[in-house]
Amino acid sequence: SIMAESVKAAESVVFNRCTEEMELGSFKRSMKALNPNIDIIFEDVSGNIISGTNDTVPYDMEADVIEVSDNDFGVWFIDCRDRPKAYDGRVVRFKAQALRDPELKENEFVASRQVMTCCEDDIALVGYIVKKTDVITDPSYPAEKEWVMITAKITYEERDEYNGMGPVLVAETIETTEKPKMEIV
């Protein structure tokens, strides 16, 4: 769509005439899904900048293992990238499709999902690098496009794939699983 292409190319976006009833966190996540580096500004009806947004997440951040449901992958993906201090060292469990990238090391793959921010034309593949540990000895597992349930410790590393710092998930367990009812989030 025209709007999605504009957001992908923009450095900043301003939402004006915002009210307390609006889900500003949802707007922010939608924009960040299209353009991770975009600066977002919210203004109230008087034109004053609103500092902070309600960034509550739909999963328990206090749990020993953060359980990300199939529908909440997109929220987690963006929040994990945007708030490294909240996630660094935490353990997460989620379902994703394994993608093999020849640029990655043999013990690495990408845990990915397709996300749609606006309409079918805007579907994009997103994911984070997963490092397999000594517990997972088969170099070919998981196979390309195999659906897996991953439990991993979240770390942050400087990586070329991210053009800087980004989440790298150190796998504790990887289990083959059924694909989700809705493959696109």
Question: Can you say where each PLM-predicted feature lies in the sequence?
Answer:
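OB-fold and OB-like single-stranded nucleic-acid-recognition modules
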Residues: M3, V7-V185
